[in-house]
């Protein structure tokens, strides 16, 4: 399986393979760290414990730090507890954190590492499909606040990312489906081959022994190319937020009870409809969004009667400038543009179209 190079001021590799613990330990040794903390989630304690024992056997002072599962772990309170623990363990600027888990764990681990002593090394070991193709690659870290998702954070690149596809065996099907939304996103913005694979055999796209490893690699290749050119989202990197403006508003309204990928799927349909209203894309391309997403069981509609709440959520999006709502939109496959300042009427019309299938 491939190794993907992320080229930046601090280049690093994304390793995609099976049984990668030995390589993780070797990388930790070569980092110069004496102390290593694995930040993980309760369901993964056994697997994290196996890695911790291997680190200890290699002569590293290793620790496991369990944080609350999912988005409930991405808070300032939880980050504070992590920093307190690092202090008790005597972590210095030369030490290392390993983020081991889903996207919430890797986001939190990266943020904790970015802030401790103004930045210590971090290795990311994503264990969910969503984290593999989205959260763990690119150096974005963050926590949530009452005002929105990931509004507090830092850009802090890992020294390595290890994607062990064996972790996919333990994931429920609905988690594989939700994570696939981020892969499909990269297909629309940069890699038509991804879309073709889903259209040809959607079932195989959900299988570790089918197309899924290739899709993971293709999606990461898209993201790594973008991140290599624009680490801090000053321009090009914004294209990775396709579907996220409305998606994040849905997550906020649902109090983060929706899976991120499901919200992004609906967000892609929303912005496709908005682009269609603006005359940027055809009815056929909007329908292609729906068909591909629905082919693997992702949602493409949203309940009505909540426009004002969602509108407020979109107003808090990080891409906005001067109080203007800005969307990443398409003119065609792999042809991405900014859609700025839509009217309330246009937004409401796009929102209303999300209910057409439900009526």
Swiss-Prot record:
Gene Ontology terms, MF aspect: 3-dehydroquinate synthase activity; metal ion binding; nucleotide binding
Pfam families the record matches: DHQ_synthase, DHQS_C
Catalysis performed (reactions): 7-phospho-2-dehydro-3-deoxy-D-arabino-heptonate = 3-dehydroquinate + phosphate
Primary subcellular site in the record, as a coarse category: cytoplasm
Positions annotated to bind Zn(2+): 182, 244, 260
Coiled coil: none
Keyword Cytoplasm: yes
Subcellular location field: Cytoplasm
Necessary cofactors: Co(2+); Zn(2+); NAD(+)
GO cellular component: cytoplasm
Pathway listed: Metabolic intermediate biosynthesis; chorismate biosynthesis; chorismate from D-erythrose 4-phosphate and phosphoenolpyruvate: step 2/7
A Gene Ontology BP annotation from the UniProt entry: amino acid biosynthetic process
Keywords: Amino-acid biosynthesis, Aromatic amino acid biosynthesis, Cobalt, Cytoplasm, Lyase, Metal-binding, NAD, Nucleotide-binding, Zinc
Cofactor comment: Binds 1 divalent metal cation per subunit. Can use either Co(2+) or Zn(2+).
Chain positions recorded as NAD(+) binding sites: 69-74, 103-107, 127-128, 140, 149
Record's function text: Catalyzes the conversion of 3-deoxy-D-arabino-heptulosonate 7-phosphate (DAHP) to dehydroquinate (DHQ).
Database matches in HAMAP family: DHQ_synthase
Protein name in the entry: 3-dehydroquinate synthase
Annotated organism of origin: Corynebacterium diphtheriae (strain ATCC 700971 / NCTC 13129 / Biotype gravis)
